[in-house]
């Protein structure tokens, strides 16, 4: 796949909701192609998402911060 098209990644785990209104879902994805093939990273996703979905990531360098529990 060409670099300008993105990198496919499979959702392997849904971690939780984040964002001020809970409209963002934090997920763990496994990169399927490219330089980081096989790497598992944490990303934030907007919109509906399920385990097994394939996302196209523009880049695989950045990783979302872990969701902290509120006290």
Curated annotation (Swiss-Prot):
The keyword Ribonucleoprotein applies. The keyword Transmembrane helix does not apply. Keywords: Ribonucleoprotein, Ribosomal protein. Transmembrane segments: none annotated. GO terms for molecular function: structural constituent of ribosome. GO terms for biological process: maturation of SSU-rRNA; ribosomal small subunit assembly; translation. Coiled coil: none annotated. Pfam families: Ribosomal_S28e. GO terms for cellular component: cytosolic small ribosomal subunit. Belongs to the eukaryotic ribosomal protein eS28 family. PANTHER family: 40S RIBOSOMAL PROTEIN S28 (PTHR10769), SMALL RIBOSOMAL SUBUNIT PROTEIN ES28 (PTHR10769:SF3). NCBIfam families: PRK04007.1 (NF003080). This is Small ribosomal subunit protein eS28. It comes from Pyrococcus abyssi (strain GE5 / Orsay).
């Amino acid at each position: 796949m060409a670099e300008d098209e993105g990198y496919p990644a499979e959702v392997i785990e849904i971690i939780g909701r984040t964002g001020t209104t809970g409209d963002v879902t934090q997920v763990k994805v496994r990169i399927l192609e490219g330089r980081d093939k096989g790497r598992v990273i944490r990303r934030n996703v907007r919109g509906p998402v399920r385990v097994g979905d394939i996302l196209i990531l523009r880049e695989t360098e950045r990783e979302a911060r872990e969701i902290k529990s509120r006290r």
